[in-house]
Amino acid sequence: VLSAEDKANVKAVWSKLGGHGAEYGAEALGRMFESHPTTKTYPFHFDVSHGSAQVKGHGKKVADALATAASHLDDLPGALSALSDLHAHKLRVDPVNFKLLSHCLLVTLAAHHPAEFTPAAHASLDKFLASVSTVLTSKYR
């Protein structure tokens, strides 16, 4: 459960991203594919090479979904319900990949925004991404 401080930290960091969300999403996906080769089995139809159009496109989708989540912190399940259905029933993404991508997102954000990435912000973002991952995997059962 995100505390009021966590919510404030998430909103503060998200407001600093500016128009770079898609870029950071693609960078995080690239990090995940390089660091965890087993994640390359999904999406099997993607060109997972660095800078590919598919990685950039999916990076934008990731960033947009996280922006939606960051603006609906009090109702993540409602805000992400359709996305949860998509990942569980159609795409069938391995649930472990959400945790791996979350870590890669944290690394990417820390690299680009070191001043904003305080220990408190790091902890809050980690909780936020874990909450998003939990919602996205909730319909796998």
Swiss-Prot record:
It comes from the Eukaryota. The modification N6-acetyllysine is found at residue 16. Residues 1-141 form the Globin domain. Coiled coil: none annotated. The modification Phosphothreonine is found at residues 108, 134, 137. One of its GO terms (molecular function) is oxygen binding. The modification Phosphotyrosine is found at residue 24. O2 binds at residue 58. Heterotetramer of two alpha chains and two beta chains. This is Hemoglobin subunit alpha. It comes from Peromyscus crinitus (Canyon mouse).
